[in-house]
């Protein structure tokens, strides 16, 4: 903040709350105004992957690109109407944001970030739904979501609706005074990262029922002497996975 007083949080405590949001731009209308989509939560967004639920609601998968942060999913209240731009403009304004918990038995749950539900109450320091969204990380902490190894890009397979998410790395996993390993983040000092995947109940991205998950790939050199740094990928060794996408043939 030595260059701009606005970033001195002691003087302007709400200035940080301006950052960490998804902003939607209409590429078809150069006169349009970008819109901040606060319902998608405030955190260190790494992409926003859009899918449609079986009943036409809009689903947005997001990772919080920081050590020990979370995977999120937003499900809109309204339904997408093909070819009706005006009707679809506000779909990302109303809906429920969820945070993921990956359990050791290979199941997972989407936990709703809704004010007044569970621990997200005024008694626990959450004044309103706006407060929950502004402090999405704290809300995830309160709900007991799974702290991940820097979740970044997310891609939904066009074949079978598996969802893939990159965990770039986390050299602090298992360090002193830091969270230890768990089923979804199984390597201490995870310098090479991994890719996790899950399949929503019924193959429906909009489902909030329990899902099944597994680790798709552990990154690193398959010949590395240290098992904690050894990859299991056939082919070229790679580490710190970041972006991923599916081509029209369904190849990741």
What are these regions (language model features)?
Residues 1-252:
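Conserved small-residue
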